[in-house]
Structures are given as structure tokens and as C-alpha cells.
């Protein structure tokens, strides 16, 4: 009887302990999506930044890959990683928000709008996460200025670039916000909506290395597709954000100017898209594989 009583008394003690720990475990579970997104971004930027600089030059000036590489060689190795701080800050924070907010908002919407289709709640969560990411537009703005060789003589680091914009008012930091909002919302909806279905069509993974390969392929395919589809928007964004001061031009107006400058040819508008395709393939492969790997071990 004593053994039976002791056995009967243990469960309440364990239940109480679990109740005390459950809020802390829930906090860790929620934070890990932000942490894993941040680490995935850091890993990606450190590896792919030089390729991003080549791509940026092509988007801004409509030049060939070889000419963009020659520009970077002329700038010297010392300037190769010039301007990496803004994208490092921007990408780590952006991807932390992208993955973390998407999970939090999806959970929140499912809880309060339980009768809505899952696809709808996840799409809204992805759109809201993308909109929130746009708060970090100033970092993307400064990155654009630091990568443009026309501004090399005006400032040499992130702090100086921020100071150069300050005298033009807060709005100057958010020049190019509209194309960023459009790009983020569109890309997030498709990324989170298609990530699961694409992975389901890949061969079944039985080992950790196979899971890593599948996650890389899934992220890479999505990244390449979205990078190609949003390429014209990024071309317009680069042109808008390379300007300091002056009137704020609308997205259609800037697009029309670029379209005329590039002889009204779609192939000229997509100059650099092939490099962007390969960069996005590698970048989002790294991001998705790193994110999913960290989720399993954190």
C-alpha cells in the first residue's frame, strides 16, 4: 500500500514541475525561429557577398558580367567587402523577422481565425512578415549607396553614409520603400507557400545528410525562381536608392525611364538575371539548409 501511495503521489509533483517549466520551454520554442533565421543569414552573406556586388553593378548600370568583375578588380581587394556591414545587419535581422514572425503570426491567426483555410492564414502571415521586414529599409538603402562606385569619394563606411542621408530628413532613409514592400510580400507568400510541396516531391530522406541536401535543393529552387521573377523590381529599387536628395519618383516613372534607357528590350532589363539566378540558388539553398539544420539541434 505504501508503494502504491508513493506512486499515486508522484504524478501531481511532476505535473506541477511541468507547469512551472512550460512557459519557459514555450519561450525557447518561439525564440529559436528568430535565432535560426539570423544564423542562416549570417552564413549566407559571408559566403555570397562578392557575387552580390557584381550583380548590383549589373542591375544599376546594365553592364555585362565581365565588365562588372573588371570594375571590382579595379576597386581592389580592399574594397571587395566594402559595405558588408549594412547587408549583414539587414539580412540577419530581416531573416530573423521573416522566419520568426511567420511562425508567430501563423500560430496567432490559426488560434483566432480557426475557420479560415490554412493556406489563407499562412499567406496573410507571410505578407505581414514581409511588410514588417520593410522597417529595415534604411540598411538596404545604405548598402546600395556603398556598393555604387559613384559614391566612393563621398563616404567610406556605413556611419558616414547614414550621416550623408540625415540632412535630407527621415524620408530619405526610406527611399525605395514601395518596391521593397511589393518584393517582400510577393516573395514571402510564394516561399512559405511552396516550400512544403516542393520538399514533398523530393526523394524521401533517411539520414541527416540527405535531409540537408533536400533542404538545400528546396530553398535553392525557390530562391532562384523568386529571384528571377522579382529581378525587374530590384532593378528599379537599385536605381531609386542610388539617388541622394531630389524629388521622390514613383515606381512606374522610374521603370519607364529604365525601360527607355535600355532600348525597350526585355533582355536588357534582365541583364544580370542569370548571375542573380545562380546567386539566389546558392544563397537560398544555404539559408534554407542552415535554418532547417539549426531547428533540429537548437
Swiss-Prot record:
Enumerate the catalysed reactions.
NAD(+)(in) = NAD(+)(out)
Note the topology in the membrane. Multi-pass membrane protein
Q: Where in the cell is it found?
A: Mitochondrion inner membrane
Q: Which GO terms describe its cellular component?
A: mitochondrial inner membrane; mitochondrion
Solcar repeat residue numbers: 28-108, 117-201, 214-297
Alphabetized UniProt keyword annotations: Membrane, Mitochondrion, Mitochondrion inner membrane, Repeat, Transmembrane, Transmembrane helix, Transport
Which parts pass through the membrane? Answer: 34-51, 85-105, 117-136, 180-200, 216-236, 269-290
**What is one Gene Ontology biological process annotated in the Swiss-Prot or TrEMBL record?**
mitochondrial NAD transmembrane transport
The UniProt similarity line reads:
Belongs to the mitochondrial carrier (TC 2.A.29) family.
Q: What does this protein do?
A: Mitochondrial membrane carrier protein that mediates the import of NAD(+) into mitochondria. Mitochondrial NAD(+) is required for glycolysis and mitochondrial respiration. Compared to SLC25A52, SLC25A51-mediated transport is essential for the import of NAD(+) in mitochondria. The transport mechanism, uniport or antiport, its electrogenicity and substrate selectivity, remain to be elucidated.
Entry protein name? Mitochondrial nicotinamide adenine dinucleotide transporter SLC25A51
The record lists the organism as Rattus norvegicus (Rat)
Q: Which gene encodes it?
A: Slc25a51
